Regions:
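Substrate-binding cleft and catalytic face of glycoside hydrolase catalytic domains
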Residues: 15-173
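Mature N-terminal, pre-catalytic/accessory segment of carbohydrate-active enzymes
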Residues: 1-18, 23
Length: 173
């Protein structure tokens, strides 16, 4: 409630569109926020490894931004548990005073299947265009990952470049 009020006030102060970003938009979980953790459960797989997409939480976030006159800065990340090369442990339980490195768990790793990753990104962009319109979605910024130069990315530089290539192709498809 108060967060929406603050976002609205920020939006109203600016003569140009304000872009707003949420982390962890593709992270697996129950959608409940916790210290240094967020999740949307946008991607899971059935028992046969087939993708299941659920945009409910992301839609709620982006609907809020748009309803308040803002634009999403769509952060493409982090890795869903079903796609992570190192899914266990997945959710961290970091608390102040603990080593910060403990925050980097399964969500920070490359995908085990780059084609499934690209399809996830494509389906998200396609869903966004279907929901908000092409003109609106083309006005957004799309960011891959966040600070891959630190522990937020546990793969190699080459794996990040590969992730970038697959992601950029999927967004533009």
């Amino acid at each position: 409630k108060d967060g929406k009020k603050l976002i609205r006030e920020i939006s109203e102060l600016s003569p140009v569109p304000v872009f707003f970003r949420a982390h962890s938009l593709l992270v697996t979980g129950d959608g409940e926020a916790a210290l240094k953790w967020g999740s949307t459960n946008a991607y899971t797989e059935d028992e046969n490894g087939n993708p299941i997409y659920d945009w409910t939480i992301i839609d709620t976030i982006f609907d809020t931004y748009i309803d308040l006159g803002m634009k999403p800065l769509a952060q493409i990340g982090f890795m869903p548990e079903a796609l992570s090369t190192h899914p266990e442990p997945y959710r961290h339980h970091w608390k102040p005073g603990a080593k910060y490195e403990d925050i980097y768990t399964g969500w920070a790793y490359p995908p085990k299947d780059y084609d499934k990753w690209a399809e996830l990104v494509y389906q998200w962009v396609k869903h966004s265009v279907d929901r908000y319109g092409k003109e609106e979605v083309e006005s957004w910024y799309w960011e891959l990952w966040n600070e891959p130069n630190i522990g937020y990315w546990r793969g190699t530089t080459e794996e990040y470049i590969k992730l970038y290539d697959y992601t950029a192709d999927a967004v533009k498809r």
